[in-house]
From Swiss-Prot:
It comes from Bifidobacterium animalis subsp. lactis (strain AD011). GO terms for molecular function: ATP binding; magnesium ion binding; phenylalanine-tRNA ligase activity; tRNA binding. Tetramer of two alpha and two beta subunits. GO terms for cellular component: cytoplasm. It is found in: Cytoplasm. The lineage of its organism: Bacteria, Bacillati, Actinomycetota, Actinomycetes, Bifidobacteriales. Belongs to the class-II aminoacyl-tRNA synthetase family. Phe-tRNA synthetase alpha subunit type 1 subfamily. This is Phenylalanine--tRNA ligase alpha subunit. PROSITE patterns: AA_TRNA_LIGASE_II (PS50862). It catalyses: tRNA(Phe) + L-phenylalanine + ATP = L-phenylalanyl-tRNA(Phe) + AMP + diphosphate + H(+). GO terms for biological process: phenylalanyl-tRNA aminoacylation.
Length: 355
């Protein structure tokens, strides 16, 4: 060994043995990295000894190189084995922490809730579609001709007065006959769309007309100035009141259950003749099973058919209408119309999705 150069193989071997022992005791990657820096880093005994080999005599270098190569390999093998073991343990611990325990009770998310009014509108539309009828959607800003004249309302009928109907200021349009000067109104009934259907599609015709209508009513427990109707019209050859009654019975069952039924009481409407009030019987009526007014109906007045260019000597028809809000009030025993229009989410939450 060259003079002045200290190369103590036993000391290096002892130091590496301590490093390997420390590796065996390590449990984290941080501990392993610290051990590697101490026993194999730039300032470690192993690194200093490796540098010292270059200063040894030629005949001593080969033997010293073998010693250092074996020590370096022993340390590297111990470090690599332990590193793989620690990483595997850490990954297993992370996986266990992230694993979902399928036996734990789930956290239920609150179900969404739709407002019951559009849901009921869809139910009514589905009823008519199931019978093969068409769904018609007309304009809410309507000509006075379609809303009144074509439906056999006389020029002096009380419904035309401003205390009952919203007139659109400054707007005039052509009526179905092409005459300019028909005032525009917010439609008071979806019956106006029935006349449009007759003119557009001709006969035979089976349509349901759901939609929003407007009256100058004050908002109270049973009235609102903006509400929804579903009106239905059937025009064909040889239709009678018996056909009307059959459809009404089916609608009552669809809306209120298998025990529900309908009855007709004589009445008057300008657009039907004969006309009838539609009463509903159902077992869940507030106060006990019984009859309650539901809507209006009748055979289409011949004058209405003539307005649409239909010959009443060949075709007959029936029509009826029910209020969607009223149906909802009866169906769910709701006491106040305010609940339907004020947008209180607590009200809608009673009608969660799927119910």
């Amino acid at each position: 060994m060259a003079e002045g150069i200290v190369f103590d193989a036993d000391a290096v071997s002892k130091d590496i043995a301590e490093g390997i022992a420390a590796i065996q005791q390590a449990s984290t990657m941080e501990e392993l990295k610290a051990i590697k820096a101490k026993y194999a880093g730039a300032n470690s005994a192993m690194t200093r000894a490796s540098k010292a080999i270059g200063s040894l005599a030629k005949n001593e270098k080969k033997e010293a190189g073998k010693v250092m190569g074996k020590l370096r390999a022993d340390f590297g093998r111990a470090y690599g084995t332990k590193e793989a073991s620690v990483k595997a343990a850490q990954e297993a611990a992370e996986l266990a922490a992230e694993t979902v325990d399928m036996t734990l009770p789930i956290r239920r998310k609150p179900l969404g809730a739709r407002h019951p009014l559009p849901k009921l509108m869809e139910d009514v539309e589905d009823f008519f579609v199931g019978m093969g009828w068409q769904i018609s959607d007309g304009p809410e800003v309507e000509t006075e001709w379609f809303d009144f004249d074509a439906l056999n309302f006389g020029p002096d009928h009380p419904a035309r007065q401003m205390q009952d109907t919203f007139y659109v200021k400054g707007n005039q349009s052509k009526d179905a006959a092409g005459f300019v000067g028909s005032n525009m109104v917010l439609r008071t009934q979806t019956s106006s769309d029935q006349v449009r259907g007759l003119i557009s599609h001709g006969v035979p015709l089976y349509i349901a007309c759901p939609g929003r209508v407007f009256r100058t009513d004050e908002l109270d427990a049973t009235h609102t100035p903006v509400f929804h109707q579903v009106e239905a019209l059937a025009v064909d050859k040889n239709l009678t009141m018996a056909d009307l009654k059959g459809v009404l019975d089916k609608l009552a069952v669809a809306m209120f259950g298998p025990e529900a039924k309908s009855r007709l009481r004589p009445s008057y409407f300008p657009f039907t003749e004969p006309s009838a009030e539609l009463d509903l019987w159902f077992p869940d009526k507030k106060g006990g099973p019984g009859w309650i007014e539901w809507g209006g109906c009748g055979m289409v007045n011949p004058n209405v058919l003539r307005s649409a260019g239909i010959d009443p000597d060949i075709y007959t028809g029936f029509a009826f209408g029910v209020g969607v809000e009223r149906t909802l009030l009866l169906r769910h025993d709701i006491n106040d119309m305010h609940d339907l229009v004020e947008g209180d989410v607590r009200f809608s939450e009673q009608f969660v999705m799927g119910e």
